């Protein structure tokens, strides 16, 4: 049942499971979608049709990181011959600020051993901040 949907790998140091979500019917997809929509503005999100198209590409991967069966975060990326492009990366709001983001990226880097491109959008804030 699990293995039909997931690629299961252990991160030894943190005892996390890395599970690949390969389609919208995956049992983890609703949790991914909840974190995704809460973490990214609408203009940076894929439509349902675009997500289905991405799943059809052999270069596209969406991996969920779980610890003790709790969905910690995800990385969606495109894997090319000499580099990897991380399109979306988010940690569930309940686990932010606890070092999971760095741990996931460190593991990701070790497993893929390629150049990693990661786009980062700056927060738009007024300076100086007003009350």
What are these regions (language model features)?
Residues 11-50:
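Short amphipathic alpha-helix that is part of the acyltransferase structural core
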Residues 95-107:
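Conserved acetyl-CoA pyrophosphate-binding loop and the N-cap/start of the following alpha-helix
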Residues 64, 69-78, 82-90:
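Conserved beta-strand in the GNAT
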Residues 89-96, 122-124:
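A short, internal acetyl-CoA/4′-phosphopantetheine-binding micro-motif in the GNAT/acyltransferase core
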Residues 39-67:
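Active-site rim helix/loop that mediates acceptor-substrate recognition in acyltransferases
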Residues 112-130:
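Conserved GNAT acetyl-CoA-binding A-motif
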């Amino acid at each position: 049942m699990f293995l039909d949907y997931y690629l299961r790998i252990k991160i030894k140091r943190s005892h996390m499971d890395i599970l690949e979500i390969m389609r919208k019917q995956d049992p983890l997809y609703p949790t991914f979608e909840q974190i995704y929509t809460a973490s990214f503005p609408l203009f940076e999100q894929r439509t349902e049709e675009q997500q289905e198209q991405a799943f059809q590409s052999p270069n596209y991967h969406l991996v969920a990181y779980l610890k003790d069966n709790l969905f910690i975060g995800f990385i969606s990326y495109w894997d090319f011959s000499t580099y990897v492009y991380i399109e979306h990366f988010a940690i569930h709001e309940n686990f932010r600020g606890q070092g999971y983001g760095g741990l996931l990226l460190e593991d990701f880097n070790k497993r893929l051993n390629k150049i990693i491109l990661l786009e980062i959008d700056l927060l738009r804030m007024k300076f100086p901040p007003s009350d």
